[in-house]
């Protein structure tokens, strides 16, 4: 069945639904790698992607954002010249009440009776001011990191801002 639009699951409504031991089976999240690049090197500049509104980010959106940032940094900077970390983990289970369509569907389906829904995916709950991604680079790749984080923010359902947390004097001198 086709994946429903992410806007159906973006708003945070109700309590967290995370207890997988009571569910019939939850699909694994598409995002599996949360830390990439060189973890040992001490980089000059650190930037963070910070959420500005509360929302739920589906695991597919987190993976799409991670892939876009990683591809841009890996191609231009190389694997040893950056560090990337994805902070939120998709714990929230998303349910969907599948409806039968087509000829004779009214005889098969029970409509909205017992419409709790089956688990179809997971999402991460994010609140205003929460850090979504952390990236670290040296001064020669600072502009590249800022552009990559901005591209990642486009793939997420909440408005985000890029904040320089380390090396702000260097980025100001570079005009970033």
Curated annotation (Swiss-Prot):
It comes from Picrophilus torridus (strain ATCC 700027 / DSM 9790 / JCM 10055 / NBRC 100828 / KAW 2/3). GO terms for molecular function: structural constituent of ribosome. HAMAP family: Ribosomal_uL16_arch. Belongs to the universal ribosomal protein uL16 family. One of its GO terms (biological process) is translation. It holds the Pfam family Ribosomal_L16. InterPro entries: Ribosomal_uL16, Ribosomal_uL16_arc, Ribosomal_uL16_CS_euk_arc, Ribosomal_uL16_dom, Ribosomal_uL16_euk_arch, Ribosomal_uL16_sf. The keyword Protein biosynthesis does not apply. This is Large ribosomal subunit protein uL16. Keywords: Ribonucleoprotein, Ribosomal protein. Transmembrane segments: none annotated. Gene3D superfamilies: Ribosomal protein L10e/L16 (3.90.1170.10). GO terms for cellular component: ribonucleoprotein complex; ribosome. PROSITE patterns: RIBOSOMAL_L10E.
